[in-house]
Amino acid sequence: IIKILVLRNFQSEVNYDQTIRRTFRVGPFDCDGLRIMTAAKYPVYMDFIRWELIARSKLYHAIVKRRLAPSLGSQKIIYRKPMKIWSKFDVILESAGMDDKWVYFVHYFEQDNEVKAIGIVRSLVWKRDIPTALTDIMKELGVTETMDPPVWVIDIFKADKEIIEKANLRKC
């Protein structure tokens, strides 16, 4: 996060819903014994690019000023093809819309113009253990219209609450 906060001073500002792209290289600590990027590293790159979006947009001041905490609510990652050590890849972050509580993003992991993995997340903003209404933040940014998430994105997370409730009822 420190790197992102320093770099924000040298990068152009982006809109809160703008698609951004960052090129990375698969390093040796990203890999498993087969020298391909381990599944655990994909969420790290997804977090990085979401933080970059916050740092480079007006969301940074809206969130930091209020001492809010952006937090991941749920994610799904589809791995299609492996990425080998030392190879370059791009992470593309696209906004998939929002509702009154959640912000949805789609992350594409591209290499040689081919999608190697896709990560879909929903996140929210917390203050003192209470999810904060995004409406206030959007008003502060001057946003009058927001994009609703597509049905396929909503459907991915539809059963989340029920899954957690059932997990809490299980016998240990």
For each predicted feature, which ranges?
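Generic structural detector for well-ordered beta-strands
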Residues: T23-G27, I78, L124
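Residue-level preference for alpha-helix termini and adjacent loops
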Residues: D30, I36, A62, K76-I78, ...
